Amino acid sequence: MIEELRFPLWASPKYDGIRGLVDLRHRLLSRKLKPIPAHVLQKRFSISLFAGIEGELIYGDPVAPDVMQMTTSAVMSVDKDDLASAVKLYVFDCFTEHRLPYWGRYQRLSRLAEKARRAGIILVEQTEIRTIDDLRDYEERIVNRGFEGVMLRDPEAPYKFGRSTLREQYLLKWKRFEDGEAVILGVEEGQRNENEQQLDERGYSKRSKKSEGMVPNGTLGHLIVRDRKNFSGLDQFHIGSGPGLTHELRAELWRDRATLKGQLVKYRFQRIGVK
């Protein structure tokens, strides 16, 4: 893909939240054009000044390990006002100005964001990218800051809802890791290592992983899953790590393990050797 890009492009961090846009009836809607449940957010953003803006609803720090879980809880609940009050809308487009090229729409957003910062409107910063080397350098900086990837835009592009094709290059996603979706087949309990602690040849402490010293710990260890599209080529595999899998969540999932089979779970992987 990278060899097919047409420069210059504008690049911004890929935010991992919930899509939010304000329609012409001044309602805050999701990507599926359904009203956002959080009453606090509807009250704050559902005004005529914001009609047409589109962005990503984010709770707290945009690069926090649990940003997606916390954002979902705050945005998709009707009764979590304290959480919802900490949500901001990171805006990147405006569909009411669809006849303008993207740079023109962005100028309009910039003026709006200056007026509306106290309401929780934040303009997503765009950086001009002129070469492949520029893109690689930018991606490295963004990933090191904790973002999962980069969004690329043609500054001359018209408005389009959703992502465009590689041929159009209006809006493209560029990230090192991809998201997959898998069906949960089963679960495995986590273990606590109670083998005797020893020192290795460098003087560092270590514990062996002898089975007799591995004790069940009452939390989720791994999900046994099968990918819906079989990206891995495996009949089944394990998912057991990730920034959102806190100790508390593992304990909750283990308590509810009887309900997990057949549910869908998202996971992140790096595709290797596939164009």
List each language-model region with its residue ranges.
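Anionic-ligand-binding alpha/beta catalytic cores of soluble enzymes and soluble regulatory domains
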Residues: 134-178
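HHCC-type zinc-binding knuckle of retroelement integrases
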Residues: 115, 123-128, 132-133, 152-153
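Active-site nucleotide/adenylate-binding loops and adjacent lid/helix of ATP-dependent enzymes
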Residues: 2-8, 128-144
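Short, structured patches in soluble enzyme cores that scaffold and shape functional sites
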Residues: 55-57, 91-96, 125-128, 154-156, ...
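Extracellular/periplasmic catalytic domains that process cell-envelope and extracellular macromolecules
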Residues: 83-84, 143-144, 216-217
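Covalent nucleotidyltransferase
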Residues: 2-122
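Classical nucleotidyltransferase
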Residues: 18-23, 27-55, 166-275
